[in-house]
Amino acid sequence: MKICMIGTGYVGLVSGVCFADLGNKVYCVDKDQKKINKLKNSLSPIYEPGLDDLIRNNLRAKRLIFTHDLQKAIKDSQIIFICVGTPTKK
């Protein structure tokens, strides 16, 4: 299955990597190009035990794609998860 995770914070990144490890092709999308570049080099912006190894293995297997191209990721996906912060009223 092809899955799109919009947002590569804690929820989007960990969920996306786990979906990829289950054999799905996962697009992880973020507007922060620096974060995407780090993730493409297997450098996680968050700490979660074992996450770096899962990122590395799934990048190598071509099941995990980090991108800032939201339109392409949505077009190529069957399921889309929106994993961005929810604004609160002040």
Descriptions of predicted regions:
Residues 1-90:
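Structural/interface elements that position substrates and couple domains in central-metabolism enzymes
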